[in-house]
Amino acid sequence: MTNEFLHFEKISRQTWQSLHRKTTPPLTEEELESIKSFNDQISLQDVTDIYLPLAHLIQIYKRTKEDLAFSKGIFLQRESKSQPFIIGVSGSVAVGKSTTSRLLQILLSRTFTDATVELVTTDGFLYPNQTLIEQGILNRKGFPESYDMEALLNFLDRIKNGQDVDIPVYSHEVYDIVPEEKQSVKAADFVIVEGINVFQNPQNDRLYITDFFDFSIYVDAGVDDIESWYLDRFLKMLSLAQNDPDSYYYRFTQMPIGEVESFAHQVWISINLTNLQNYIEPTRNRAEVILHKSKNHEIDEIYLKK
């Protein structure tokens, strides 16, 4: 075990699934299929074995937070204000963060009676392409400097205080922020914030993004596996763009497949792998739970912070 995991409890899938009584997953096969990323793989068995125990653990953390807030209120002799329970989900590009986040959104809304759950991706806090071009960092898109971290921190602060917030919307199809389009994030019982950068420190290191999280998850996998999933996703995006000239990926449909594969591999090496090794993976130990995926996308190990 490396020093990074000294303060984590390593739990096998078999042990983890025994930590929660067996119940029927509160969603159908069709619903599960509709929320998974198109190159991801997940089954109702995964929901039962991994995600229902995880939802139960989140319930424990939420109850603990509420008990502490109540005790603080007594100490300060004032009524404690209700705050959303904020969950951060991080991990590499193409590792399956979005599937995990969307699944949690459904499970939490159905596990907690009448609970409202909002889901936000930090892609909306990327600077628009034009801004990146003007700053000369379009080739650094996805790296820490390409995000408006001040806006992200401001969003988290307002959400933590129970305010409704409108945030920008990012489209992977057009590879840019969508002008004039906003996502309205309402005050909710749970807010899930998903992105490669949610555990990273902003340049203003007096305030950390993780300070706003009540629970945090890192989705992990071997580098070779993530590369394979990324290349597979890239090629599948091409198939979706065949008849869509507005798609960022449409131009690649006009190229020989060998050139496309070479380009995608170069993007992985120069951008995504570099970003993973230098900025994303080093934040892994800031998570409360690390979900490790094997080659077939199945979660085989769980690391729980002691």
UniProtKB/Swiss-Prot annotation:
Its EC number is 2.7.1.33. It is found in: Cytoplasm. Keywords: ATP-binding, Coenzyme A biosynthesis, Cytoplasm, Kinase, Nucleotide-binding, Transferase. GO terms for molecular function: ATP binding; pantothenate kinase activity. GO terms for biological process: coenzyme A biosynthetic process. It catalyses: (R)-pantothenate + ATP = (R)-4'-phosphopantothenate + ADP + H(+). The keyword Phosphoprotein does not apply. Pathway: Cofactor biosynthesis; coenzyme A biosynthesis; CoA from (R)-pantothenate: step 1/5. It comes from the Bacteria. ATP binds at residues 91-98. GO terms for cellular component: cytoplasm. Its main location: cytoplasm. InterPro entries: P-loop_NTPase, PanK, PRK/URK. Belongs to the prokaryotic pantothenate kinase family. PANTHER family: URIDINE KINASE. HAMAP family: Pantothen_kinase_1. This is Pantothenate kinase. The gene is coaA.
